[in-house]
């Protein structure tokens, strides 16, 4: 009996060529995560400071603009309105910090919107636990 390995080989090739970001099912890639320490350094140095947008319940980080929780459509519209004045290659950092990163209801809708609008240089602040533990308790700059 002759076995046909072509379908299996085809599946292996397709799976090897998948975008690594698609495996996480997140709208951002690893390269689009910005560590809090690096953003703090940029704010402190005053050089190369990106546009910083809070998409959560409060404005904590120095120099940031508050939009409100982006789980709500009216705040997604506020974000859309704000960034309509930005260039597609502007450096932009979004952050929330309301809860552990994996459970946050605000970051995915906001980041998805930025992708759909064609922004090329937007990042998500890598707040793994919450804004208190990952920013305030670290002594980083606050409003």
Predicted regions: what they are:
Residues 10-11, 114:
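Generic alpha-helical structural signal
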């Amino acid at each position: 009996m002759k076995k046909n390995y072509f379908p299996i080989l085809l599946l292996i090739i397709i799976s090897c060529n998948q975008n690594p970001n698609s495996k996480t099912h997140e709208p951002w890639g690893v390269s689009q995560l910005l560590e809090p320490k690096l953003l703090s350094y940029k704010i402190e140095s005053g050089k190369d400071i990106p546009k910083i947008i809070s998409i959560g319940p409060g404005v904590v980080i120095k120099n940031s603009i508050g939009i409100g929780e982006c789980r709500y459509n009216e705040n997604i519209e506020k974000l859309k309105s704000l960034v309509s004045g930005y260039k597609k290659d502007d450096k932009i950092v979004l952050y929330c910090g309301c809860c552990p990163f994996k459970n946050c209801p605000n970051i995915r809708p906001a980041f998805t919107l930025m992708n759909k609008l064609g922004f090329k240089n937007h990042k998500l602040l890598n707040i793994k636990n919450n804004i208190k533990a990952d920013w305030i308790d670290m002594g980083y700059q606050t409003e």
